[in-house]
């Protein structure tokens, strides 16, 4: 499973990072804002799991289900 957290280290970003770590989910952290803009992201955090992009709410739901 490929998990990428797109983050600017904002408070919501840190919540997702903490939850991923608490569930022992391995993830890569991406802080490249140019890439985020190129992907069409208007907010952070965003979570990508096996190519599926999730916003904060969807990412929380996914993490909680793991």
Residue ranges: model-predicted function:
Residues 33-37, 61-63:
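A short acidic, often aromatic-flanked loop/helix-cap motif at beta-alpha or helix-coil junctions
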Residues 39-47:
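Structural micro-motif
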Residues 37-38, 54:
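Short secondary-structure boundary/hinge segments and terminal tails
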Residues 48-66:
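Non-catalytic, surface beta->alpha helical segment in thiol-disulfide oxidoreductase systems
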Residues 26-34:
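A short beta-strand-loop structural module common to alpha/beta enzyme folds
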Residues 17, 40, 66:
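Short, flexible helix/strand-to-coil boundary loops that buttress conserved ligand/catalytic motifs
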Residues 1-27:
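Local sequence-structure signature of Cys/Sec-based thiol-disulfide redox active-site neighborhoods
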């Amino acid at each position: 499973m490929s998990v990428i957290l797109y983050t600017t280290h904002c408070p919501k970003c840190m919540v997702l990072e903490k939850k991923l770590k608490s569930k022992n989910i391995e993830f890569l952290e991406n802080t490249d804002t140019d890439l985020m803009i190129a992907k069409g992201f208007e907010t952070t955090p965003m979570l990508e799991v096996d190519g599926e992009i999730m916003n904060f709410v969807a990412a929380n739901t996914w993490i909680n289900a793991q």
